[in-house]
Amino acid sequence: MTDTGTHRPQGGLDEETRQMVVDTVRQLAKRLLTKKAVLAWDRDEIFPEDAIREMLSPEIGLQLLFIPEAYGGMGGGAKDCCEVVREMCKICLGVGTAFFAIQLGSDPIIVGGTKDQKEKW
């Protein structure tokens, strides 16, 4: 069988969509995760809640990356999550780690939750 390059792993985004999400993260980083802001957070030992909340806002919706499409998410897989987290960590390890923790928090519900729990959360 010849690989046409169109194979999509189960539960993952296609290349075009993944690149669009990564580009969105890069644009957000330029605006929210400036070097000055990141250094101030580190210096003052501040958790950048406002920046993270904006990334998770309904308009942007990065928290939906790992959620199946059947439940209103993007249907991304592990590779997609890693690409997005890697992009965030290039700028601020704290923000990348916080975002990754949010993604991991959805996994128990996706894997073991009831239909009602999946629809609610």
Each predicted region: which residue ranges?
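N-terminal glycine-rich flavin-associated loop
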Residues: 96-115
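Amphipathic, small/basic residue-rich leader segments at the start of a protein or domain
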Residues: 1-99, 120
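Short, hydrophobic/aromatic alpha-helical segments in well-folded domains
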Residues: 108, 120-121
